[in-house]
Amino acid sequence: IPPSAKPGVYKGKVVVSAESGFPVSVPVILEVAPESLPAPAHWQVHLDLWQHPQAVARWHDVEPWSPEHFALMKPVMKRLADAGQKAITCSLIDEAWNAQTYDWFPPMIEWVKGKNGTMRWNYANFDKWVSFMMNEVGVKGQISCYTMIPWNMKIRYLDEATGKYKFLDLKPNDPSYEAIWGPFLTDFRKHVKSKGWLGKTCIGLDERPDAMVRAAKNVLDKYAPEFK
């Protein structure tokens, strides 16, 4: 019922028909109350249904993050926005959930170890996705980034020296954990701040032991305290 509908009692009928048989007319009485809901963007319920953009690309056999991919995602994601969706699901690393879904969940941020041994990060797909969800779909409340504690406790990166993908082992409460995440969080914080997204960015932690969560939070508070 559109917000412009006047309160009152409306009467009509619904005609049900099929390929065989006679149409059936059903009387309908509808009472419209004087209250109306605000636009979904202003609803207070924090709706956070996770999105999997890669699944849309796979189903339609299009190049991920291409114009065709975004065109196919728009009506799907718009339904979420119309339901009051507040959060954008983002992947910091490759397979944060260790391949528990049918479709591969790739990173939106590429980790690359340069020939000089320094790690750098490519945010191109992350920026495309967040900008699309905010500006074209209308989901603007929160950027949920998964995760600092993946289920397989590994981070995939591209080693420029060999041209091959390799993995970093994550050990919360070990100095190596901070050595891995500290530089990333420093760079990532700087990046989202430059985009105007700092106050909306959150680090998602999913079904992880308390000791791991506390270790991750200690590192997070040290390098990017604005992140929720």
Predicted regions and their residues:
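Aromatic-lined carbohydrate-binding surfaces of glycoside hydrolases
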Residues: 10-18, 24-227
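Short, surface-exposed loop/turn segments at beta-strand-coil junctions that are enriched for proline
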Residues: 2-7
